[in-house]
Amino acid sequence: SLLLLGLGRVILGIGQSFAGTGSTLWGVGVVGSLHIGRVISWNGIVTYGAMAMGAPLGVLCYAWGGLQGLALTVMGVALLAILLALPRPSVKANKGKPLPFRAVLGRVWLYGMALALASAGFGVIATFITLFYDAKGWDGAAFALTLFSVAFVGTRLLFPNGINRLGGLNVAMICFGVEIIGLLLVGTAAMPWMAKIGVLLTGMGFSLVFPALGVVAVKAVPPQNQGAALATYTVFMDMSLGVTGPLAGLVMTWAGVPVIYLAAAGLVAMALLLTWRLKKRPPSALPEAASSS
């Protein structure tokens, strides 16, 4: 029934949230907080890689065994993940009194806002690039999405140590600049190749935004609160992607599809200004966080 389907989606969302945050912090506990940027980057690579493979594999499973076969396959994959995780040594929890949620939110919300603003570019590419190509009368929207994915994953693979070398806020500002150029190219594209270059640059720019800001956000709290900080920080991206679609749809019906990419570039520019302010006047936090900027 619809009720069971909705309940299943809620449970799936809760489980996915714990799995994503927990696995990231597990990795940080294994390799140390110095490499938190690389851990977040690799977590994103395997997550988006699984999503990319999941769609075609899901179609094959559905064709082979129907909806029940698909459900059993997904449960089998989840069970395999549990079996692989069980024999691995546990990570010792950090002792100390945890901060209340309000205090954690107060330390990470500015970084979350910058992430939310920058996520608008990702949202309009993923949701509206097909409509954009259709409005222009062009072919190749699927290839444009492929370019975005390749640029996203490729940038993380090519620059694994960039955050440690330059600092999270510096990397974020560079990424914002690249993302802005990409969105402006898409919004003003008169030829398909301009749009494809713009999509490629947007993927490159957005790739390191999450780990770059996440490093600083997580280190703004004591170690025993880093799980709560990462979860809170991630919510800003989820909320941004949730509202980007409807709002961009309203703008599109009023002013046309290209305008939403120009508007997204403006939001990313706001993220750039906010991050520059955080760089010049960092909020009161732990000394470790200030050194990561």
Predicted regions mapped to residue ranges:
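Paired small-residue
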Residues: L3-I11, W193-L201
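Helix-loop-helix hairpin linking two adjacent transmembrane segments in secondary transporters
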Residues: W42-L86
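Cytoplasmic helix-loop-helix junction between adjacent transmembrane helices
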Residues: G8-V46
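Extracytoplasmic gate region of multi-pass secondary transporters
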Residues: L110-L145
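Structural signature of the two symmetry-related core transmembrane helices
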Residues: M75, N170-L185
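Small-residue (Gly/Pro/Ala) motifs that create kinks and tight helix-helix packing interfaces
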Residues: A50-Y62, T130, T244-M252
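C-terminal membrane-cytosol helix-exit motif in multi-pass small-molecule transporters
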Residues: M75-A93, L274-K279
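Helix-to-loop junctions at the C-terminal end of transmembrane segments
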Residues: T155-G168, M252-T253
